[in-house]
């Protein structure tokens, strides 16, 4: 492990943690950063493990609430329905992810220009939905009906195209379906737990033969950086979107996507 690879691992870990739970596409940012920093050769193991750091971050922040909901579920119909809603929203990603995993990883993930374009388009959509979404009918995350949860799950499948953003797709879907801005972000947090844990396990299984023990140092640096950054973001985001909405992230996507697209078209 050299100083340069450690620094790049730190940068990518921070990037993963800072962007995983805001609607800007952590995968898109990671792939573009890896392309421009020349870190693409680090292998799948690095990407997979640092995302686990982000999963553990949201579990850490929401541990007490998750435990209380699980304990209440046998006697509280609303808690039981909420857990069912999260699991139901998770199912479409399982089906599509298993069926299309090879195409997504070998074709879509290798197209930086597509990622930049999706960042821009997603930013435009996010700005529009943030301003034009219908008045919310579900202002608490536990109020989301099962049918709405399933539809949010189908929105999540759009995020398998890198640059779309898992949190962005689920938040946009939730807003369009009548969920309040804070509740939309919180539902996205809860949905990320089974989705990202499942993606981690599946990717780890698929890439078990290419895990690089020699990269453990970089992986550890990226993992810790992703975990710490994600904890800060999860604790900050709900209060921010309750007051200001999602327009900041829409403009962020458009600016980053435009800069990346211009650089790629110039041959970088």
Swiss-Prot record:
Its EC number is 3.6.1.27. GO terms for cellular component: plasma membrane. It holds the Pfam family BacA. The keyword Cell inner membrane applies. One of its GO terms (molecular function) is undecaprenyl-diphosphatase activity. It comes from the Bacteria. It is a multi-pass membrane protein. InterPro entries: UppP (IPR003824). It catalyses: di-trans,octa-cis-undecaprenyl diphosphate + H2O = di-trans,octa-cis-undecaprenyl phosphate + phosphate + H(+). Catalyzes the dephosphorylation of undecaprenyl diphosphate (UPP). Confers resistance to bacitracin. Belongs to the UppP family. Bacitracin is thought to be involved in the inhibition of peptidoglycan synthesis by sequestering undecaprenyl diphosphate, thereby reducing the pool of lipid carrier available. This is Undecaprenyl-diphosphatase. It comes from Cereibacter sphaeroides (strain ATCC 17025 / ATH 2.4.3). The lineage of its organism: Bacteria, Pseudomonadati, Pseudomonadota, Alphaproteobacteria, Rhodobacterales.
